[in-house]
Amino acid sequence: MKIIYVTNQDPNSQCDYQEVSMLHGLREVLGDDCIDYPRKKIMYGDFSESPKKELHGWGFSLLTEPIQDVKNRQLCEVDFVIYGVTDAYGVKNLPEVDKLAERGVWYLDGHDHSKITKTPCFKRELFEPHENVFPTGFGIPEHRIMPIDFSNKVQIIQKTAPPYATFGPQILGPTARQLYVFNNEQDYYDDMNRSWFGLTCMKGGWDSLRHYEILASGSCLLFRDYDRKPKLCAPQDLPCFFYNSAQDLRDLLSRLVVDNKPTQEYIDMVYAQREWLLTCGTTKVRAIKLIEVLNEQVS
């Protein structure tokens, strides 16, 4: 299968997590048969037009290691054209590219809202079944996954726990940069790795790269209001402990770790979450699922 992956070129919005994570996975799976067009410079470690410190999340996790470039960017014998951000950031269809798709034009919808803007598409904030719309979500590169280690825990929750997860205000958009605690990505991961729990919650949408980073760090993810998330919406079928109140959270913290030692219930959940991450939540498996759907729907 050969794909042209149409990218967003707005220099002020280069690190769209859905676009970047899927491109990472597709390149890993398809290699030279996934051509980013135009070439997505930040994926290759080129931040000359979009400085890393100005990117969403400072490029942590998804831009740690440059992806390998393709050897041939000739746009021919193409099966699919996929728009990496659908119609966000002013992206419009390119008729001269669309006509190259022998098997169809698809869209990757990373909008935080549940509205369907173009089909056929893959959508992370999918609230109910819709014709020609298929669930997807963020992913994290396999190289970012740390070993599980229960012996190095020194704190209950991570320093970067969002205020809303502890029943404070929901802080979104550029204002959320005030919540960035670490300048160094490894320090960010080490903090989660040394925490018994990683608290998370809904942001602009239900899916958040934070979920995957907590899982990758080897901390036990606790998800505020996960039981209220629509089933088809990412992260789908994630094993986790959820809580709806401050008392729920206190009860979980005291029940799962006793005298600074993990209970069997805690241990079992951490390993279940790691299995989910490896089978459902990496950039590679997200890309594999996308390719499977394309082949099933267009035979």
Go through each PLM region and give its residues.
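Catalytic cores of extracellular degradative/oxidative enzymes
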Residues: 202, 249, 271-274
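Conserved acidic donor-binding segment of nucleotide-sugar-dependent glycosyltransferases
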Residues: 239-247, 256-260
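Short amphipathic alpha-helices within nucleic acid-binding modules
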Residues: 252
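A charged, aromatic-enriched C-terminal amphipathic alpha-helix characteristic of glycosyltransferases
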Residues: 257-298
